[in-house]
Amino acid sequence: MNSRIAVVTISALTLMAAAAGSLRWLKDRVRMGEPGVRIVGLPLLSESGRLATSNSVFLPDSLPGFRSQLGAIPELELSFLPPDTTFGRRSYDGGQSLPPVSASVVLMGADRTSIHRPEYCLTGIGWQILQQTVRRIEVPGWPAGSLEVQRFDMTRIVERDDGRRVTINGVYVFWFVADGIRTASHSARQWQMVQDILSKGRSPRWAYISFFSLSEPGTEEVTFERMSRLIAAAVPAIEREPQTASR
């Protein structure tokens, strides 16, 4: 019995060493692809006011019908994500007593752990996803239906300053883009990355683009249409060029 345990242990250690060696071999030989978003020399601050990053992903500051301002990066996000992550943050205000639309971009660096499955992050901060759908947004000058996005209708209970607990609702829209690739599916993104690493020796440098707005219950479709107009106007400036859709 002891000899069998020894054989199993040695075999397991050998496999672990071989796997570790293979990972090191891949890391040394896999090159990083070009980003599918525009990077500019615009610094972003953390919520505490310190410099978070000297470069950022470009988000247009002027769009028809919207005023905008730069957003700050939460300290928790900065401490959780790898230091080579590049961010983009901006809030768009359409006036007319409508809630602002928050735009966010997370661009991975050599450390591919910058981007996680959106469902995990959202539920981790208290949101409940009520409905998940795939939608298409028409972008002027792009092929019809080329921007496919995921849409989450969500709800959350928050505590106000006076101690009262209230329910809020929101619409969250996102997709992923790299150089020459776009997908609304996290699983497709991961599979594409594996394919490119194994077949091309190249890791796509994915960006996770998302937009969020609060929404009154029952007005989610109206909110999505308003967000769609903003996204259609913004995305040609965010992405480096029209991409090839991937699923």
Identify the meaning behind each predicted range:
Residues 4-28, 136-247:
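A short, solvent-exposed beta-edge/loop patch
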Residues 27-50:
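Alpha-helical transmembrane signal-anchor/signal-peptide segments
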Residues 34-41, 57-59, 198-200:
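Short, charged helix-to-loop "capping" segments that act as catalytic/coupling loops
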Residues 49, 67-199:
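Short, solvent-exposed recognition patches
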Residues 54-73:
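Amphipathic alpha-helical segments
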Residues 58-59, 84, 201, 226:
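Generic detector of ordered secondary-structure context
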Residues 64, 99-101, 205-207:
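Envelope-exposed proteins and targeting segments
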